[in-house]
Amino acid sequence: MEGGGGSGDKTTGVLAGFFGAGEAGYSHADLAGVPLTGMNPLCPYLNVDPRYLVQDTDEFILPTGANKTWGRFELAFFTIGGCCMTGAAFGAMNGLRLGLKETQNMAWSKPGNVQILNMVTRQGALWANTLGSLALLYSAFGVIIEKTRGAEDDLNTVAAGTMTGMLYKCTVSEMALDSPFCVLLSGS
Protein backbone atom coordinates (compact mmCIF):
# COMPACT_ATOMS: atom_id res chain seq x y z
CA MET A 1 0.00 0.00 0.00
CA GLU A 2 1.35 3.36 -0.90
CA GLY A 3 1.55 6.02 1.79
CA GLY A 4 0.38 3.56 4.42
CA GLY A 5 3.78 2.77 5.84
CA GLY A 6 2.25 0.59 8.53
CA SER A 7 1.69 -3.01 9.36
CA GLY A 8 -1.19 -5.02 7.97
CA ASP A 9 -3.40 -4.65 11.08
CA LYS A 10 -3.69 -0.84 10.83
CA THR A 11 -6.51 0.82 8.93
CA THR A 12 -5.46 3.02 6.05
CA GLY A 13 -7.28 5.79 4.25
CA VAL A 14 -8.97 9.01 5.25
CA LEU A 15 -10.31 7.76 8.60
CA ALA A 16 -7.13 5.96 9.63
CA GLY A 17 -6.39 8.43 12.44
CA PHE A 18 -9.74 7.78 14.05
CA PHE A 19 -9.27 4.04 14.22
CA GLY A 20 -5.85 3.84 15.82
CA ALA A 21 -3.43 4.05 12.91
CA GLY A 22 -1.16 6.51 14.74
CA GLU A 23 1.61 5.98 17.25
CA ALA A 24 0.98 5.19 20.91
CA GLY A 25 0.77 8.34 23.02
CA TYR A 26 2.40 6.96 26.20
CA SER A 27 5.81 5.64 27.08
CA HIS A 28 4.50 2.69 29.14
CA ALA A 29 1.93 0.36 27.65
CA ASP A 30 0.33 -0.99 30.82
CA LEU A 31 0.20 1.94 33.29
CA ALA A 32 -3.52 1.70 33.91
CA GLY A 33 -3.90 -1.96 33.05
CA VAL A 34 -5.18 -1.10 29.58
CA PRO A 35 -3.04 -1.80 26.54
CA LEU A 36 -2.39 1.52 24.81
CA THR A 37 -0.66 0.29 21.67
CA GLY A 38 -2.22 1.52 18.48
CA MET A 39 -4.39 4.13 20.24
CA ASN A 40 -4.78 7.54 18.68
CA PRO A 41 -7.19 9.79 20.62
CA LEU A 42 -9.89 11.69 18.80
CA CYS A 43 -9.03 14.85 20.71
CA PRO A 44 -5.47 15.92 21.60
CA TYR A 45 -6.71 17.31 24.93
CA LEU A 46 -7.72 13.80 26.03
CA ASN A 47 -4.19 12.49 25.53
CA VAL A 48 -3.35 12.33 29.26
CA ASP A 49 -0.76 10.16 30.92
CA PRO A 50 -2.69 7.75 33.23
CA ARG A 51 -0.07 8.20 35.98
CA TYR A 52 -1.55 11.61 36.71
CA LEU A 53 -5.04 10.17 37.19
CA VAL A 54 -4.14 7.96 40.16
CA GLN A 55 -5.49 9.35 43.44
CA ASP A 56 -3.70 8.42 46.63
CA THR A 57 -6.22 9.96 49.03
CA ASP A 58 -9.86 10.90 48.99
CA GLU A 59 -10.52 14.46 47.94
CA PHE A 60 -13.54 16.39 49.18
CA ILE A 61 -14.84 19.78 48.19
CA LEU A 62 -15.96 20.53 51.73
CA PRO A 63 -13.87 19.76 54.81
CA THR A 64 -14.93 16.66 56.68
CA GLY A 65 -17.80 17.42 59.05
CA ALA A 66 -18.66 20.76 57.46
CA ASN A 67 -22.23 21.46 56.43
CA LYS A 68 -22.97 22.99 53.06
CA THR A 69 -24.77 26.28 53.56
CA TRP A 70 -26.18 28.41 50.81
CA GLY A 71 -25.21 32.04 50.70
CA ARG A 72 -27.52 34.92 49.98
CA PHE A 73 -26.67 34.88 46.25
CA GLU A 74 -27.43 31.15 45.83
CA LEU A 75 -30.73 31.58 47.66
CA ALA A 76 -31.66 34.47 45.37
CA PHE A 77 -32.23 32.17 42.40
CA PHE A 78 -34.42 29.82 44.43
CA THR A 79 -36.36 32.74 45.93
CA ILE A 80 -37.02 34.48 42.63
CA GLY A 81 -38.02 31.29 40.81
CA GLY A 82 -40.21 30.11 43.67
CA CYS A 83 -41.99 33.46 43.87
CA CYS A 84 -42.61 33.52 40.12
CA MET A 85 -44.09 30.02 40.19
CA THR A 86 -46.17 30.77 43.29
CA GLY A 87 -47.42 34.00 41.74
CA ALA A 88 -48.35 32.19 38.54
CA ALA A 89 -50.28 29.53 40.47
CA PHE A 90 -52.19 32.01 42.64
CA GLY A 91 -52.77 34.29 39.65
CA ALA A 92 -54.16 31.41 37.63
CA MET A 93 -56.55 30.51 40.47
CA ASN A 94 -57.61 34.16 40.77
CA GLY A 95 -58.06 34.36 36.99
CA LEU A 96 -60.21 31.24 37.04
CA ARG A 97 -62.33 32.74 39.82
CA LEU A 98 -62.74 36.04 37.97
CA GLY A 99 -63.38 34.31 34.65
CA LEU A 100 -66.09 32.08 36.10
CA LYS A 101 -67.66 35.09 37.83
CA GLU A 102 -67.76 37.13 34.60
CA THR A 103 -69.11 34.32 32.45
CA GLN A 104 -71.69 32.88 34.85
CA ASN A 105 -74.56 34.64 33.03
CA MET A 106 -73.29 33.56 29.60
CA ALA A 107 -74.26 30.35 27.90
CA TRP A 108 -71.52 27.73 28.19
CA SER A 109 -69.81 28.10 24.83
CA LYS A 110 -66.44 28.62 23.19
CA PRO A 111 -66.35 32.42 23.72
CA GLY A 112 -66.95 31.87 27.43
CA ASN A 113 -64.17 29.28 27.59
CA VAL A 114 -61.81 31.60 25.73
CA GLN A 115 -62.64 34.45 28.10
CA ILE A 116 -61.91 32.24 31.12
CA LEU A 117 -58.65 31.07 29.57
CA ASN A 118 -57.64 34.67 28.84
CA MET A 119 -58.34 35.69 32.44
CA VAL A 120 -56.32 32.75 33.79
CA THR A 121 -53.38 33.59 31.52
CA ARG A 122 -53.51 37.34 32.17
CA GLN A 123 -53.85 37.06 35.94
CA GLY A 124 -51.21 34.32 36.17
CA ALA A 125 -48.68 36.42 34.29
CA LEU A 126 -49.53 39.55 36.29
CA TRP A 127 -49.11 37.87 39.67
CA ALA A 128 -45.97 36.00 38.58
CA ASN A 129 -44.41 39.24 37.36
CA THR A 130 -45.34 41.12 40.54
CA LEU A 131 -44.07 38.48 42.97
CA GLY A 132 -40.98 37.81 40.85
CA SER A 133 -40.13 41.52 40.82
CA LEU A 134 -40.55 41.75 44.58
CA ALA A 135 -38.35 38.69 45.06
CA LEU A 136 -35.73 40.18 42.74
CA LEU A 137 -35.69 43.43 44.74
CA TYR A 138 -35.55 41.55 48.04
CA SER A 139 -32.71 39.33 46.85
CA ALA A 140 -30.74 42.23 45.37
CA PHE A 141 -31.09 44.28 48.55
CA GLY A 142 -30.13 41.23 50.62
CA VAL A 143 -26.96 40.58 48.61
CA ILE A 144 -25.97 44.27 48.64
CA ILE A 145 -26.51 44.57 52.40
CA GLU A 146 -24.61 41.35 53.09
CA LYS A 147 -21.64 42.45 50.96
CA THR A 148 -21.68 45.92 52.53
CA ARG A 149 -21.89 44.75 56.14
CA GLY A 150 -19.76 41.66 55.68
CA ALA A 151 -22.08 39.65 57.94
CA GLU A 152 -24.76 37.07 57.32
CA ASP A 153 -27.48 37.47 59.95
CA ASP A 154 -31.17 38.20 60.50
CA LEU A 155 -30.64 41.95 60.36
CA ASN A 156 -29.86 41.63 56.64
CA THR A 157 -33.19 39.88 56.09
CA VAL A 158 -35.17 42.50 57.99
CA ALA A 159 -33.37 45.37 56.25
CA ALA A 160 -33.81 43.81 52.79
CA GLY A 161 -37.52 43.23 53.42
CA THR A 162 -37.99 46.77 54.72
CA MET A 163 -36.19 48.33 51.78
CA THR A 164 -38.16 46.19 49.32
CA GLY A 165 -41.46 47.21 50.90
CA MET A 166 -40.50 50.87 50.96
CA LEU A 167 -39.43 50.84 47.32
CA TYR A 168 -42.55 48.93 46.27
CA LYS A 169 -44.89 51.29 48.12
CA CYS A 170 -43.10 54.49 47.08
CA THR A 171 -44.06 53.89 43.45
CA VAL A 172 -47.79 53.62 44.23
CA SER A 173 -48.70 57.31 44.46
CA GLU A 174 -47.28 60.60 43.26
CA MET A 175 -47.03 61.92 46.81
CA ALA A 176 -44.89 58.93 47.79
CA LEU A 177 -42.50 59.64 44.92
CA ASP A 178 -41.36 62.78 46.78
CA SER A 179 -40.35 60.77 49.85
CA PRO A 180 -36.65 60.88 50.78
CA PHE A 181 -36.26 57.13 50.26
CA CYS A 182 -37.54 57.24 46.67
CA VAL A 183 -35.45 60.31 45.91
CA LEU A 184 -32.39 58.54 47.35
CA LEU A 185 -33.03 55.35 45.33
CA SER A 186 -33.75 57.16 42.09
CA GLY A 187 -30.66 59.34 42.41
CA SER A 188 -32.50 62.54 41.49
UniProtKB/Swiss-Prot annotation:
Keywords associated with the record: Membrane, Mitochondrion, Mitochondrion inner membrane, Protein transport, Translocation, Transmembrane, Transmembrane helix, Transport
Bilayer disposition of the protein: Multi-pass membrane protein
Pfam families cross-referenced by the UniProt entry: Tim17
Cellular component per GO, a single term: TIM23 mitochondrial import inner membrane translocase complex
One example of a Gene Ontology biological process annotation: protein import into mitochondrial matrix
Cellular localization per UniProt: Mitochondrion inner membrane
One Gene Ontology term of the molecular function aspect: protein transmembrane transporter activity
InterPro entries named among the record's database cross-references: Tim23, Tim23-like
Transmembrane segments: 73-93, 125-145
Function statement: May participate in the translocation of transit peptide-containing proteins across the mitochondrial inner membrane. the PAM complex.
Family label: Belongs to the Tim17/Tim22/Tim23 family.
PANTHER family: MITOCHONDRIAL IMPORT INNER MEMBRANE TRANSLOCASE SUBUNIT TIM23B (PTHR15371:SF34), TIM23 (PTHR15371)
Protein name as it appears in the record: Mitochondrial import inner membrane translocase subunit Tim23B
Originating species: Homo sapiens
Lineage: Eukaryota, Metazoa, Chordata, Craniata, Vertebrata
